[in-house]
Swiss-Prot record:
BP GO annotations: AMP salvage
Cellular component annotations (GO), alphabetically ordered: cytoplasm
Metabolic or biological pathway: Purine metabolism; AMP biosynthesis via salvage pathway; AMP from ADP: step 1/1
Record CDD domains: ADK (cd01428)
Protein name from the UniProt record: Adenylate kinase
Length: 187
């Protein structure tokens, strides 16, 4: 079984690499960002609540995100593993995830962190905003998201390193180069 976490700052390529890896491993990609954006688009109660935070570049409250994850990992397609993309983002969320998985008889096997310099991230995200028209990808919001990441998410590296589950991967390179580096860490 492969239960994998993809970590890295916004724009590091987590979503792109997750799609490739999930297809190769035949496991589902669980993207909290995609689930939240869909809820916002459909104006569900959770989506309306989440939108306020997302528009400001702030993290959506743990209670909302944990509930989403709990429901999702119980689905049949997660029986043989899953890849979490964009969660956990804080040590508190990681603790809650570990407790949730333990109750389900599961655990995280590997946490992969994609490392990309801030200047490259800003360039990628501004380019994505133009191509995809994502409202949450303007320069002020991007800088706030990177600041949030640096303050709240970076401590997760120590959390998973202490569990001997962390792999650091250079996220700068061609799609194929980065994919190859990630696959080496999963052997």
């Amino acid at each position: 079984m492969k239960n994998i976490i993809f970590m890295g700052p916004p724009g590091a390529g987590k979503g792109t690499q997750a799609k490739i890896l999930c297809a190769r491993l035949s496991i589902p990609q669980i993207s909290t960002g995609d689930i939240l954006r869909e809820a916002v688009k459909n104006q569900t109660p959770m989506g309306i609540e989440a939108k306020r935070y997302m528009d400001a570049g702030d993290l959506v409250p743990d209670s909302v995100v944990i509930g989403i994850i709990k429901d999702r990992i119980r689905e049949a397609d997660c029986k043989n593993g899953f890849l979490l993309d964009g969660f956990p983002r804080t040590v508190e969320q990681a603790d809650a995830l570990d407790a949730l998985l333990k109750n389900e008889g599961k655990s995280i096997d590997k946490a992969i962190n994609l490392e990309v310099p801030d200047g490259e991230l800003l360039k990628r995200l501004l380019g994505r905003a133009e191509i995809e028209g994502r409202a949450d990808d303007n320069e002020a919001t991007i800088k706030n998201r990177l600041d949030n990441y640096n303050k709240k998410t970076l401590p997760l590296l120590d959390f998973y390193a202490a569990q001997k589950k962390l792999s650091q991967v250079n996220g700068v390179g061609t799609l194929e180069e980065v994919t190859s580096l990630i696959q080496r860490e999963l052997v």
